[in-house]
Amino acid sequence: MGQKINPNGFRVGVIRDWTAKWYADKDFADYLNEDLRIRKYIEKRLADASVSTVEIERAANRVNVSIHTAKPGMVIGKGGSEVEALRKELNKLTGKRVHINIVEIKKPDLDAHLVGESIARQLEARIAFRRAMRGAMQRAMRAGAKGIKTQVAGRLNGADMSRIESYSDGTVPLHTLRADIDYSWDEANTTYGVLGVKTWIYRGEVLPTKKNSNNDEQGGK
């Protein structure tokens, strides 16, 4: 099962936490749709800010949004202008009071979503897929990863028939629950069609009582 299941969901409750931290009874569907709208809006609004994860917490009529990004300065803006504008936009979108926390990702080369997104953008820029994948793997291993696996699927280099190419370095123990494995799936929209990019990064083992995080510094607005 470890080879098939999403590694992030497989480890929730063991070494990972939920990205949506709230409970609802009859309003569950409304809150879930609101979460999806918030995530989609932030993804579109901060497309160039290297945003990896958006965590949402709820309390009464208040929504706390934590944005994990490798470029906190771009999200915050000069004197906090950008994050304040974003907060007002989310207030209008949800009709609730929104509080935004900016969490800096200290090592973006160890974040699967940012690595996969980087590979996807290079594929869109017509860079050879092998070069993009191997470059990302080398940077991740230099940053301290214990192992990394990347996979690209689709009409590679414009070939008539789609295929899957994958490369790995180090070890990626998918069956080990205490293994801190970050996983991401991204898309590259090329002139030949859509390419799927999957990334697995093994960052070491974690005790179940200690939830590992790639984010060290946190600021709020």
Curated annotation (Swiss-Prot):
Q: Which SUPFAM superfamilies match?
A: Prokaryotic type KH domain (KH-domain type II), Ribosomal protein S3 C-terminal domain
**Which Pfam families does the record cross-reference, listed alphabetically?**
KH_2, Ribosomal_S3_C
Tell me one GO biological process term: translation
Listed under GO cellular component are: cytosolic small ribosomal subunit
Q: Does the keyword Ribosomal protein apply?
A: yes
**KW Ribonucleoprotein (keyword) present:** yes
Name the SMART domains on file: KH
KH type-2 domain residues: 38-106
Q: Which GO terms describe its molecular function?
A: mRNA binding; rRNA binding; structural constituent of ribosome
Q: What is this protein called?
A: Small ribosomal subunit protein uS3
Q: Which species? A: Limosilactobacillus reuteri (strain DSM 20016) (Lactobacillus reuteri)
| Gene name for this UniProt entry | rpsC
